[in-house]
From Swiss-Prot:
The lineage of its organism: Eukaryota, Metazoa, Chordata, Craniata, Vertebrata. This is Ubiquitin-conjugating enzyme E2 variant 3. SUPFAM superfamilies: LDH C-terminal domain-like (SSF56327), NAD(P)-binding Rossmann-fold domains (SSF51735), UBC-like (SSF54495). Keywords: NAD, Ubl conjugation pathway. Possible negative regulator of polyubiquitination. In the N-terminal section; belongs to the ubiquitin-conjugating enzyme family. UEV subfamily. In the C-terminal section; belongs to the LDH/MDH superfamily. GO terms for molecular function: oxidoreductase activity, acting on the CH-OH group of donors, NAD or NADP as acceptor. NAD(+) binds at residues 191-219. InterPro entries: L-lactate/malate_DH, Lactate/malate_DH_C, Lactate/malate_DH_N, Lactate_DH/Glyco_Ohase_4_C, NAD(P)-bd_dom_sf, UBQ-conjugating_enzyme/RWD, UEV_N. Residues 2-145 form the UEV domain. One of its GO terms (biological process) is protein modification process. It holds the Pfam family Ldh_1_N.
Length: 471
């Protein structure tokens, strides 16, 4: 079948990089001439919809001496080729999905090639070649008896409506045990912050296994040093599937450099997370996702939307470090006779953070609290947020989560419904943390007009930026 360049060009319509996409699909047709192209509505996890080019067909997979034609579907995002395709199996009525390392229960395909996608070195032809190689190791589909076909038709009707997501269904081909690892933690990103988190968590001794996912090309200096000095229970990998069964997955990776505007910088982070979060959520379906990537409020929201996890299991590091410092300043530097544990820094990381009291501290009058907060916040401003200090703060949060300490931390959580907020935004609020993430948001003092006004202003600006992002 001859590739119809002009027909595909018309289908691409308003795609940003139409010529590049047409050229790549033309190359695909040389090896796979029978793919069929169309434009259909793609439903994202946040229920938003977009008309996207997609193509379907089969790829030949040799398994145990026999060739199987595996039906697949590729969705091409409008930012292609700078964003990877979204890939699904397309089983017929007599086929059933075999959930495994690279396929979830809804047929979505996860591969290292997708996670490491980078134009121009990445291409759909290369992706298909890796797909074939992985499926030769573990066949993603198997036939079902004819008596079960009616049931499968219903399932397929459901699958066609589902485009993304994580299922907690335990199906054949996927291990049902936890590999006998009690406390496994994954750190995503091998930059300075990722290394700092790895070292701080290792020093606390709270992980039976600690995995550092290195997303860089080649080996970074930090990961090379970790390899050389061989920390106990620490493993370095580039394979996302190595993170399977983690109790906490920590996102430290950032892709903010070289962008022409703040919006473009944040969008580049979102694009990276689009390839990471669904796969990592698939491999660790009961994990708490701890976000340290910047801007933490927005990236926590993005992680929540892409993972489809309950909001309680997506936690941003928020103002935990500033809160711990503030409490230390009040009790140890200013020598105030109070526990210091009833005051937190809340809101948005950066200049818009604000001090808030829980109302349980009966030692200080409201006016004394206000004066103390002002003095303490002035001292707090001289403190930076270097990687090692953030790493210690992350380790503190992980310790509370892993050991179910139910301590109060000021962390980024879904703030809708608090302080009169109506939008889905993440802001730092005092929360009780445990193995399930956020179990409760602590109420602070009523009538704090400054706090309420600051949080509402932050929420408004964050929501406005989120509306401009492409998830």
């Amino acid at each position: 079948m001859e590739f119809d360049c002009e027909g595909v060009r018309r289908l691409l319509g308003k795609y940003k990089f139409r010529d590049l996409t047409v050229e790549e699909l033309k190359n695909v047709s040389v090896s796979f001439p029978h793919f069929r192209y169309s434009v259909d509505t793609y439903v994202f996890k946040d229920t938003s919809q977009k008309d996207l080019l997609n193509f379907t067909g089969t790829i030949p997979v040799m398994y145990q001496g026999k060739t199987y034609n595996i039906p697949i579907r590729f969705w091409i995002l409008d930012s292609h080729p700078f964003a990877p395709p979204i890939c699904f199996l397309k089983p017929t009525a007599n086929m059933e999905i075999s959930v495994g390392k690279h396929v979830d229960a809804k047929g979505r395909i996860y591969l290292p090639y997708l996670q490491n996608w980078s134009h121009p070195k990445s291409a759909i032809v290369g992706l298909i070649k890796e797909m074939i190689a992985k499926f030769q190791e573990e066949l993603p589909l198997y036939s079902i008896p004819s008596s079960n076909e009616a049931q499968q038709v219903d399932l397929l009707a459901y699958i066609t409506k589902i485009t993304e997501g994580v299922s907690d269904i335990n199906s054949r081909g996927w291990t049902n045990h936890e590999n006998k690892i009690l406390n496994k933690i994954t750190v995503v990103g091998s930059g300075d912050l990722g290394i700092a988190c790895t070292l701080a968590i290792s020093a606390k001794g709270i992980a039976d296994k600690l995995l550092l996912l290195d997303l860089s090309d080649g080996m970074s200096q930090g990961t090379m040093d970790l390899d050389i000095f061989n920390l106990p229970n620490v493993e370095i990998s580039k394979d996302l599937s190595a993170s399977a069964h983690s109790k906490v997955v920590i996102f430290t990776a950032n892709s903010l450099g070289g962008s022409e505007s703040y919006l473009h910088a944040v969008q580049s982070n979102v694009d990276m997370f689009r390839a990471l979060v669904p796969a990592l959520g698939h491999y660790s379906q009961h994990a708490v996702l701890l976000v340290a990537s910047q801007p933490v409020e927005i990236m926590s929201y993005v992680t929540w939307k892409l993972s489809t996890f309950p909001a309680t299991r997506v936690v941003g590091i928020g103002c935990n470090l500033d809160s711990q410092r503030l409490q230390y300043i009040i009790t140890s530097v200013l020598k105030v006779q109070t526990s210091g544990k009833e005051v937190w820094v809340v809101g948005e990381q950066g200049e818009n953070k604000v001090c808030s009291w829980s109302g349980r501290d009966g030692v200080l009058s409201p006016s004394s609290q206000a004066q103390l907060s002002s003095r303490a916040m002035e001292l707090l401003k001289v403190k930076g947020q270097r990687s090692w200090s953030v790493g210690l703060s992350v380790a503190d949060l992980v310790d509370t989560i892993i050991n179910n300490k139910r301590k109060v931390h000021s962390v980024s959580t879904l703030a809708k419904g608090y302080y009169g907020l109506d939008n889905e935004v993440f802001l730092s609020l005092p929360c009780i943390l445990g193995t399930g993430g956020v179990s409760e948001v602590i109420k602070t003092k009523a009538g704090e007009d400054t706090v309420t006004g600051t949080l509402q202003a932050s929420a408004s600006s964050i929501h406005a930026l989120q509306q401009q992002l492409e998830l």
